[in-house]
Amino acid sequence: TFDYDTIFTSKTIEALLALLMHSGVDAIAPLQTKREANAVMFALPGVTPEQQTTVDEDWFKKPVQRVATAHFGCTFLRCAALKKTPKPWFLAKANEQGEFTGGHVDEDIAFWRAWESAGNTLGIATHVSVGHAELMITWPSRTTEGGKIQQHTTEYWNSGQQAPEGAWGFVA
């Protein structure tokens, strides 16, 4: 699977396919950081996606580590394993209040749970990473040194459509 906002090269593809062929896992994903966050998108087995986890430096000594979930930005799946995975593949589940505002299961997590329940495995390529493109708003700065101020789009929408402090001439 490939996402439009994932940045990689042909060498990335070669490395992931070689690891998939020789690691014994049914799917493999590279390390990828979540947009606007300081977190790599995967969950260790037995850890819920909401929990923050850290790994020791030794964890990266193996070229592939088993994980429970990963991001789909540049992920390879074995077709035979996909055929074993029960459908529907991408079905989100609301929380107990019937909402999707926390405590729910997103489509990708539901897929990986179904993947695992079918007896399939997922690995993270610990030495292969991909970029995650972010859309930023660039504002003219009040200072001549910087020339610009950047703001994440979600910060703009969550702040009531306000420009960041130091932006020049924004009329709200």
Where are these regions (language model features)?
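Surface-exposed, flexible loop/turn segments at secondary-structure boundaries
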Residues: 7, 33-36, 130, 138
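Preference for short coil/turn "hinge" residues that link or interrupt alpha-helices
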Residues: 1, 60-63, 123
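C-terminal catalytic/acceptor-binding lobe
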Residues: 84-172
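Generic alpha-helical scaffold signal
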Residues: 7-10, 105
